[in-house]
Amino acid sequence: VYETLEIVKRKKPKECALIGFAGAPFTLAAYMIQGSGEKNFSKCVSFFKREERGFLLLLDKLADLTARHLINQIKSGAEVIQIFDSHAKIAATNNKLRDFCIKPVEKIIKRVRKEVRNSYIICFPRNIGINYIDYAANLELNCISLDQNVDRRWAIENIKPKNQIRCYQGNLDPKILAKGGKKMQKEIHKILKDFTGVNHIFNLGHGVLKETDPENIKELIKTIRDQEK
């Protein structure tokens, strides 16, 4: 990973930012315990309900390892790092968002910034709804990434990171990108309009679906860049 970052850093165009990333401790633990992806991660839920102390120890260890991994990415050329908590909704649903998601990520951020000052950090706690408010208010972020279910105007009015830096990333529905066409164009312009006047990084509300035509991605990028001219 680090060697790849160094190579890309040397060869990429100057106008392109190099973003490093890692899974958040809760999402990593969910996959480790479950053994694979599952909608409800039932084995993970059963484990943390039965062995919460052990689960917290696991999250703490994963926070240490993730912080080191991100620090190494920055030292290898990453200009921005993003922490993905794709399954944060499970913690939120069980009233454990603060203990299972916020506190471990807070530890990561503090570790990273202690060793690499002024690090630019984006966090993505997917599908936590109104809990975005509490999540952002307790973390010193440079940017908060929004899933496609978040109302953008509501986000601008209500989601305020602890350090008051206001930047939003997102939140085109991956299904709309996969379909492409006029509906995609309409949604792109709507997103750009909704984020007018605030710092915004255009992105999807989650990952690119495997059935997405690469031409749709090219069209998306061209549309955004044409809008910026």
Locations of the language-model features?
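Active-site loop segments of alpha/beta catalytic cores
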Residues: 2-229
